[in-house]
Amino acid sequence: MKTSPRHQCRASEPGTTRRTEDEVIVGVPTEIKTEEYRVAITPVGVRELTAHGHRVLIQTGAGAGSSIDDASFAAVGAEIVPGAGDVFAAADMVLKVKEPQPSEIAMLRPGQVLFTYLHLAAYPAEAQGLIDSGATAIAYETVELPSGALPLLAPMSEIAGRMAAQAGAHHLERPAGGRGLLIGGV
């Protein structure tokens, strides 16, 4: 059987040198957008992917903001790699939480898949950069069920709604410059 270039191991890939035809290398870099602490996958997700024959590369410290250490990812089969460049160079699919920053867009390549929240309307230069990269970008917020439901956007909307009340309550406190009011009364 001839192996296509897509299925050959690239020199920059950590770990094994042989690749199966159906294996996908999934990469997860550390989020670099200001005030973003989430990670695009949990150890449970890594275990599921590796159980189905895929490789998962996690950048060192990618889960730290979510209180997930590298050892937790490695314990379920992830390969921990030192930098974002290692993730982008080897991964067929890159998973992120937020839209890629310009330095990340520069690392994307034709044929690579990026799966993340994009929200590109506010970022025309980044949108053009994604087009120019030749990568396929899939926005979480556009994944739609036949019913029209947006299963990847709904949980974020619910969290935002709950956080709005909490943030509002904080700003009513005197130390935050508010009038010292309590939501719900005393």
Where are these predicted regions, by residue range?
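An N-terminal-biased, well-structured beta-alpha scaffold segment characteristic
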Residues: 13-129, 133
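Glycine/serine-rich phosphate-binding loop and adjoining beta1-alpha1 elements at the start
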Residues: 2-5, 11-25, 31, 102-186
